[in-house]
Amino acid sequence: MDSQLYYRSRCQLVDLAAKYFIPLRQSYRFKAKEVLFRAQGYGHAKQYRRMHKQVKVLKNYLGRVCRDIERYCANTAFAAEDLMQALCHANRLLSQQKRDKNKLYSLHAPEVECISKGKARKRYEFGVKVSLVTTSKQGWVLAAKALHDNPHDGHTLSESIDAAIKNTGVMPEYGFVDRGYRGHSETRLQVFMSGQRRGVTKSIKRWLKRRSAIEPVIGHMKQSHGLATNRLKGKVGDQINALSAAIGYNFALLLNKLSPT
């Protein structure tokens, strides 16, 4: 992933330099492509030491192009907005370390974050967290909100319940959540977690089994209602996409209920 980012950032800077007639000592247009393919080949063959050497070469190419443009801008006081933004992204890429927080994962969508899934098949996802509140019985989506800066699930529960109350005008009596919500501070309703034993009656136990019914809702919203791929730009676009997916899912559920078959 780093090799692709270094390559694309260098391409972006070279194209902008050509647009504004900024002279470069070398653009590395052909050499960088060759090094990128070599790095990807080594990665596919699991020759990681060789791969990291090629990634370092791509990083050096980006740094040289970046410094050329910065020197030109400093000497001529030139400051185009798109060029400054591309330089900012390039410097952010060059300075970030392996274990840094708030890393840059995408040039066209800088707000993208790395979300740890904790699953063997898919350990990480890249995007923005979305919090969903659904009814336990029929699975209507009551609230959908994009959560930036990758917050802990337990810190988002009160905010999600507030959105559900605002949308429906009804105060829920119980909430059923998974174990990711440990450490929450919600006190307005009784919250039960998956695997909880204390205070769980037979009735609550039956409702707690319904908690997993939200998983296919998330799957349907991702596959059929555009939640998996957001084509709207920026943080506002993330919020609009989450709401649109929830509205689309609710309409599909409503049509299914109204259909005669």
Label the predicted regions.
Residues 119-122, 129, 222, 233, ...:
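A general lysine-centric signal
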Residues 143-149, 232-238, 257-261:
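Short alpha-helical "patches" and their helix-cap loops
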Residues 1-173, 179:
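Polybasic low-complexity intrinsically disordered regions
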Residues 224, 228-229, 253-261:
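A short, flexible helix-boundary coil/loop motif
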Residues 6, 153-154, 210, 214, ...:
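Short, charged, low-complexity patches
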Residues 1-16, 225-238, 243:
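Compositionally biased, low-complexity linear motifs
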Residues 166-236, 240:
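Helix-centered, glycine/charged polyanion-binding patches within enzymatic domains
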